[in-house]
Amino acid sequence: MCGSYYGNYYGDHGYGCCGYEGLGYGYGSLRCGYSSCCGYGHGYGSRFFCGCGYGCGSGYYY
């Protein structure tokens, strides 16, 4: 589960930071972890879109 420290408040699109191999590193619209994408989820107006549960573990931008 992506963003495991804070849970997936938006279902598949976890609130917070999606780190390498799906670990959670902090929260908010900041980049953190190794090759990660953070934000409020895919399509929530965040600068960094992260499809938690789809490609977040690899740090893909959507």
From Swiss-Prot:
Instruction: Report the GO molecular function annotations.
Output: identical protein binding
InterPro entries from the entry?
KAP6
Q: Does the keyword field hold Repeat? A: yes
Q: Which UniProt keywords apply?
A: Keratin, Repeat
Q: In the UniProt record, does the keyword Ligase occur?
A: no
The UniProt entry's GO CC annotations, sorted and at most eight, read: cytosol; intermediate filament
Q: Which GO terms describe its biological process?
A: keratinization
Record's subunit section: Interacts with hair keratins.
**Role, per record:** In the hair cortex, hair keratin intermediate filaments are embedded in an interfilamentous matrix, consisting of hair keratin-associated proteins (KRTAP), which are essential for the formation of a rigid and resistant hair shaft through their extensive disulfide bond cross-linking with abundant cysteine residues of hair keratins. The matrix proteins include the high-sulfur and high-glycine-tyrosine keratins.
Q: Which family does it belong to?
A: Belongs to the KRTAP type 6 family.
Q: What is this protein called?
A: Keratin-associated protein 6-2
Native source organism of the sequence: Homo sapiens (Human)
Gene name, per UniProt, is KRTAP6-2
